[in-house]
From Swiss-Prot:
The keyword Transport does not apply. It comes from the Eukaryota. This is Class I hydrophobin 1. The keyword Signal applies. Residues 1-18 form the signal peptide.
Amino acid sequence: MAFIKSLLIASVAAVAFAAPQGGASDNNKKVEIDGQDSAPVCGNGQKVACCNSGEDLIGLNCLSIPILAIPIQKACGSNIAACCQTGDSEGNLLNLEANCLAIPL
C-alpha cells in the first residue's frame, strides 16, 4: 500500500512539474518585427521614394514617402523602394534628373 501511495504521489508531482506554468514555460519571448524602417536607409540629402520599376530608375514614375516612420515594405507595397536626390527646393522628385538607387529589402 505504501508503494502505491508513493507511486501516486510521484506521478502527480511529475504531471504538475510538466504542466505549463502561465505563459511561455521555456522563457521564450515573442519578438515582432514589422519591417525595415526607412529613416536610416538614405543619406547625402536623398529621400526614400516608391518607384514603379527597378530595372532603370531614371525616368520612372516615383512618389516621395513623406512619413519615415512607416516601414518601407508597407509604404511601397509591390513597387520598388529607392533613395533619390530631391529635384527642387520643395523636395519633389524630378524623374529625369533624379539619381535613384534601389533599396534592397
